[in-house]
């Protein structure tokens, strides 16, 4: 321990780690305050658990005047925990140590010089003799370390303290971390910001009249391109690198140049955060055809749109038609309207996004180019002002910058930052931060902290489903408030919140995929950490959390494009002990928000195609209440909100209802839980009756009806089909495709040219004829060979021919088999006999008296079939090892059976 003592005696500057971090952050422009303003966050875990008041306010950019030095408090806590004997030992050590310091001052030594040798070992020896642990030594002011923490008083091995919270040394005046874009993307240097606004009156669905115009798609042939992105990463390419600001160089002006003040051409733009528009074609004075950009590095998923128009005219009726949507069904067919944002309205009247549009029609594209079918969305609109800047969107945008501004305000709040810890979970493919929030009140004891259950919430795994972010914002607003219910929830739960799982997709304006070109919500089982870091680290974090404590609930916030209202997808539990328990939370949520949430739209069937989703993977990991919350892009068909669009406030209120339902779900008085469970059983009974009635069957449910599989009763979910977005990331898939193409080309070179059926038949007949002729020739050849064997054996006495002539007529296909292995009554293959011509049969029988030619299915002995006379050849028997005494050998040919005897 003495080197540590010597080091601390030398130090006159702040902690080296903090000094290094100060210089590092100052170099990159993130910190310009005084060194003394660094917050003291080296808090002992034991102190934090027993003294919640000592929890650091890590968000302040100045020295915390509200919270005293926690290390000083920690130092005062040690005497409470130690015995009187240890107190006396520590006091003796302190006296010895201070005497050492006094001797140094008396000798005029600098604090940077070590003590003399005779005092060198004295303090450390005293500590070792007293048996004081390292953590006790840290209580001394001169031995205190801000980087080493001890969980217990008798802990020997220290641990490094956790990094300081994000934004803890930033203020709201400092710039945020700029979003990183793929290097192929051009980005305009403008800050796009929208105000939040709730319309005072309900925004009703559009009521189709039946006479809506269906414009014919004409494209560039008859129209004029007024906006088009030059460089768009398409299918076949893949993400390589990113940078702040995207593509290097000067940002080109893609919109057309106006010819004068009378030119009424609209100026389009979408090269900003979450923007998505690839091309605009002017087909008439006030009519435009729009083409959306697909998700980067794919050719799919065109649903989300968000773009800007300028140079508007107030009294004109404009028509916009999006020509390349991919989903055959949409909420636009049942009255959903697009969103409009007027910059002049926001500046002058404080009015934000609102639903606008008439003559709305969703229909199939009439173009047939042999590719996948496209669908069109057309609507008309009148802009409120001349020369206005307006935005259109599929739903209320919520960008990555919006999230960072919100988290920065939380980190700089002196109260909220005490129970909300902000960390970096990981970095995305482009290098953007994936944030993790841990929200809980400090516990009084370690036992109380360990007894807390966890709740995991996440959003924006699909970047185009911005409604998930608004629900998450409503949840955070409530759980971080000073409401008594929020304080109670923080007392009994540890909340792990992932507000944006796919920041890259949100930044570039994707609808469903990440920069890997794949749907992240199908890869929660992945092992490819480098390709899917956000999902891999999320699953790993939850896995570690399950090892520490029970996770009561997991919920992933999504958006739905084909069904109205809000509903949940869950997982049926096969454990009879917890039968129907997974449906209690959704039913409670339905009761708390009856005009928004539809329990009858919920589904709990686990499909094979959903095995890679977060909901199913977390359920497989042991989280019983694992859900996907689907909030519609449209509105409600329930209660007082029937046939009205959802607003931002409606979605944020759902976040509050989630918190309220959590309290009901965990109420010590289980009356609500029991009532919901009984109601669920009755609903299930009615559903079973309905199913059997549809099948025309009658069933008695008074018995063990609960044994009926719930998956058989429920229909499949109407969720999105992302099968095309499964599989390897794009860069690996491209490599696999290249290898497959090379294999196909290699095989193609070996293959012969294709033939017609007539040619194949002629070739087949010719081949069969050649085989028959060959079999006939083999029969004559083998018969001649057998007659040769019957001649005088002296033929083999010639040394020159003895080794050559027998091999001359030897057929390599000759197979010798032991005749004793076949029963005498077993018939030979009749098909073999038919292949021998009658004339050859007679000739062979006449020329080979020493051989028996069997062409009949049964062996018989007659005058024409006499056994061969006994003779013993004078060549060594070892020359034919397969021949044994007393055994007959059969030389088998494709069309002939010849029996020889030794």
Swiss-Prot record:
InterPro entries tied to this protein: Cytosolic_carboxypeptidase, Pepdidase_M14_N, Peptidase_M14
GO cellular component: centriole; ciliary basal body; cytoplasm; cytosol; microtubule cytoskeleton
Peptidase M14 domain sequence ranges: 396-666
Keywords assigned by UniProt, alphabetized: Carboxypeptidase, Cell projection, Cytoplasm, Cytoskeleton, Hydrolase, Metal-binding, Metalloprotease, Protease, Zinc
Broad EC category: hydrolase
Ranges of compositional bias, category Polar residues: 853-866
tRNA processing listed as a keyword: no
CDD domains named among the record's database cross-references: M14_AGBL2-3_like (cd06907)
Superkingdom of this protein's organism: Eukaryota
Function per UniProt: Metallocarboxypeptidase that mediates deglutamylation of tubulin and non-tubulin target proteins. Catalyzes the removal of polyglutamate side chains present on the gamma-carboxyl group of glutamate residues within the C-terminal tail of tubulin protein. Specifically cleaves tubulin long-side-chains, while it is not able to remove the branching point glutamate. Also catalyzes the removal of polyglutamate residues from the carboxy-terminus of non-tubulin proteins such as MYLK.
Record protein name field: Cytosolic carboxypeptidase 2
Species annotation: Homo sapiens (Human)
């Amino acid at each position: 321990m003495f080197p540590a003592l010597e080091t601390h005696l030398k130090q006159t500057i702040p902690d080296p780690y903090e000094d290094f971090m100060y210089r590092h952050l100052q170099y990159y422009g993130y910190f310009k305050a005084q060194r003394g303003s660094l917050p003291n966050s080296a808090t002992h875990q034991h102190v934090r658990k027993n003294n919640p008041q000592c929890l650091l306010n890590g968000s302040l950019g100045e020295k915390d005047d509200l919270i005293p030095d926690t290390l000083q408090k920690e130092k005062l806590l040690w005497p409470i925990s130690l015995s009187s004997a240890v107190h006396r030992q520590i006091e003796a050590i302190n006296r010895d140590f201070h005497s050492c310091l006094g001797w140094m001052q008396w000798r005029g030594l600098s604090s940077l010089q070590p003590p003399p040798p005779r005092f060198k070992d004295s303090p450390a020896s005293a500590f070792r003799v007293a048996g004081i642990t390292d953590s006790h030594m840290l209580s001394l002011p001169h031995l205190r370390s801000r980087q080493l923490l001890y969980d217990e008083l008798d802990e020997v091995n220290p641990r490094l303290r956790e990094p300081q919270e994000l934004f803890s040394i930033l203020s709201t005046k400092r710039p945020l971390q700029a979003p990183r874009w793929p290097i192929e993307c051009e980005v305009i240097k403008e800050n796009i910001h929208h105000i939040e606004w709730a319309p005072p009156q309900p925004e009703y669905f559009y009521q189709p009249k039946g006479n809506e115009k269906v414009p014919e798609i004409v494209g560039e042939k008859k129209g004029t391109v007024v906006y088009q992105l030059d460089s768009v990463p398409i299918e076949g390419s893949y993400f390589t690198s990113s940078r702040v600001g995207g593509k290097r160089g000067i940002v080109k002006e893609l919109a057309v140049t106006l010819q004068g003040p009378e030119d009424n051409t609209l100026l389009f733009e979408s090269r900003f955060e979450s923007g998505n528009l690839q091309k605009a074609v002017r087909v008439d004075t006030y009519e435009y055809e729009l083409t959306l950009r697909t998700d980067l590095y794919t050719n799919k998923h065109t649903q989300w749109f968000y773009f800007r128009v300028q140079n508007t005219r107030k009294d004109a009726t404009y028509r916009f038609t999006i020509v390349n949507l991919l989903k055959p069904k949409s909420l636009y067919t049942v009255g959903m309207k697009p969103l409009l944002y007027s910059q002049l309205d926001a500046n002058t009247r404080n009015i934000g996004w609102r639903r606008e549009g008439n003559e709305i029609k969703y229909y199939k594209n009439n173009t047939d180019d042999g590719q996948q079918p496209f669908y069109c969305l057309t609507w008309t609109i009148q802009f409120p002002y001349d020369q206005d800047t307006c935005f259109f969107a599929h739903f209320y945008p919520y960008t990555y910058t919006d999230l960072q501004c919100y988290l920065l305000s939380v980190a700089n709040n002196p109260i909220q930052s005490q129970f909300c810890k902000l960390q970096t979970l990981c970095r995305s493919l482009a290098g953007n931060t994936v944030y993790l929030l841990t929200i809980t009140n400090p516990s009084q004891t370690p036992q109380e902290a360990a007894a807390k259950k966890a709740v995991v919430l996440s959003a924006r795994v699909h970047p185009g489903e911005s409604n998930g972010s608004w629900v998450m914002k409503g949840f955070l607003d409530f759980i971080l408030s000073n409401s008594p219910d929020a304080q109670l929830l923080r007392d009994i739960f540890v909340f792990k919140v992932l507000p944006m799982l796919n920041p890259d997709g949100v930044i570039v304006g994707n609808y469903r995929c990440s920069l890997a070109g794949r749907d992240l919500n199908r890869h929660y089982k992945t092992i490819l950490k480098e390709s899917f870091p956000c999902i891999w680290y999320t699953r790993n974090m939850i896995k570690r959390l399950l090892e520490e404590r029970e996770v009561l609930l997991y919920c992933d916030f999504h958006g739905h494009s084909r069904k109205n209202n809000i509903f949940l997808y869950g997982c049926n539990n096969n454990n009879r002990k917890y039968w129907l328990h997974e449906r209690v939370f959704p039913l409670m949520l339905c009761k708390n928000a009856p005009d928004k949430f539809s329990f009858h739209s919920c589904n709990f069937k686990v499909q094979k195609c959903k095995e890679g989703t977060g909901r199913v993977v977390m359920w497989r990991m042991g989280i019983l209440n694992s859900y996907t919350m689907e909030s519609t892009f449209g509105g409600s068909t329930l209660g007082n909100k029937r046939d009205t669009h959802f607003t931002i406030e409606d979605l944020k209120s759902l976040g509050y209802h989630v918190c309220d339902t959590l309290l009901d779900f965990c109420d010590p008085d289980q009356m609500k839980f029991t009532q919901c469970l009984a109601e669920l059983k009755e609903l299930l009974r009615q559903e079973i009756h309905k199913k059997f009635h549809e099948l025309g069957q009658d069933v008695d449910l008074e018995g063990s009806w609960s044994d009926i599989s719930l998956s058989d009763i429920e229909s499949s979910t109407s969720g999105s089909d992302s099968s095309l977005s499964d599989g390897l990331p794009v860069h690996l898939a491209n490599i696999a495709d290249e290898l497959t193409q090379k294999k196909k080309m290699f095989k193609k070179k070996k293959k012969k040219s294709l033939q017609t059926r007539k040619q194949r038949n002629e070739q087949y007949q010719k081949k069969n004829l050649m085989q028959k002729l060959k079999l006939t020739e083999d029969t004559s050849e083998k018969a001649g060979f057998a007659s040769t064997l019957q001649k005088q054996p002296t033929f083999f006495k010639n040394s020159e021919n003895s080794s050559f002539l027998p091999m001359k007529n030897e057929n390599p296909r000759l197979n010798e088999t032991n005749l004793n292995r076949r029963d005498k009554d077993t018939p030979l293959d009749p098909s073999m006999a038919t292949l021998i011509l009658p004339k050859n049969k007679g000739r062979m029988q006449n020329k080979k008296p020493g051989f028996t030619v069997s062409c009949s299915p049964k062996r018989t002995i007659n005058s024409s079939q006499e056994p061969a006379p006994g003779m013993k050849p004078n060549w060594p028997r070892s020359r034919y090892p397969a021949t044994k005494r007393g055994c007959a050998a059969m030389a088998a040919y494709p069309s002939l059976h010849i029996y020889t005897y030794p």
